[in-house]
Regions:
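Long, low-complexity serine/threonine/glycine- and acidic-rich segments characteristic of extracellular
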Residues: 159-215
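Catalytic-core segments of enzymes that bind and process phosphorylated/nucleotide-bearing substrates
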Residues: 1-156, 166
Length: 215
């Protein structure tokens, strides 16, 4: 973690499951969770899962007592310390913003959360409906801020100028551009491949993928 920024970007994937860390960080940010290492940089309320061999370490959410305590219009990057250094690596910023939008579009919105808040309120005899206002305001704010920080672009394939082509090779590498909501390619109805994200401080949105042409 003490490596210079350029070296950290090249080495961090060897020890951290960065994608999992960015998704957990997005959840903490959206939910306005206080008293936690993830948002406030406090030195507690973090657990680590270290797989055998020590690669792919995952940070686990822990002791989330103070939910919805952050401002609904607070920063969309609330991590500090070394996590913020990892998050600010261009590729990881792109991944993090993608997770924020994915959660806002799927689960962190009042339409999805209303029945769950009602359900768990009934289970413990409490009224959680007031939380919907925070969720609505926070999700709208985060969606707006992401679009402001990184304006949307259209998906495109830039290999061969985006034109059709033919090859006798057993695989081909395609390159292109895509916004933060582009992470994988559907090769068949049952097969997805993650794109290799190519991001720099000047341009976040490059991608490439090696596609097998012979089964």
């Amino acid at each position: 973690m003490d490596l210079p920024n350029d070296q950290l970007g090249r080495k961090i994937d060897e020890v951290m499951d960065v994608d999992a860390w960015m998704r957990a960080a997005a959840m903490h940010n959206l939910s306005g969770i206080g008293d936690t290492w993830w948002n406030a940089g406090l030195q507690h309320n973090l657990r680590l899962y270290v797989p055998q061999g020590g690669r792919g370490v995952v940070g686990l959410p822990w002791d989330l007592d103070f939910v919805f305590t952050g401002s609904a219009t607070g920063p969309i990057k609330s991590a500090g310390g070394n996590l913020r250094r990892v998050m600010d690596i261009p590729t990881n910023t792109r991944i993090y913003y993608g997770h924020l939008l994915d959660m806002v579009d799927t689960v962190f919105n009042p339409e999805y959360m209303e029945p769950w808040l009602a359900h768990y309120g009934n289970v413990i005899d409490q009224n959680f409906s007031g939380r919907l206002s925070y969720i609505r305001s926070r999700s709208n704010f985060v969606r707006s801020r992401v679009r402001s920080e990184v304006p949307p672009i259209s998906f495109s394939i830039t290999t061969n100028g985006g034109e059709s082509m033919s090859t006798e090779a057993r695989s081909i590498t395609l390159e292109g551009e895509g916004w933060v909501n582009v992470r994988s390619a559907l090769l068949t109805r049952k097969s997805h491949m993650l794109l290799r994200l190519v991001s720099t401080e000047q341009f976040l949105f490059g991608w490439s993928i090696s596609v097998p042409l012979v089964v």
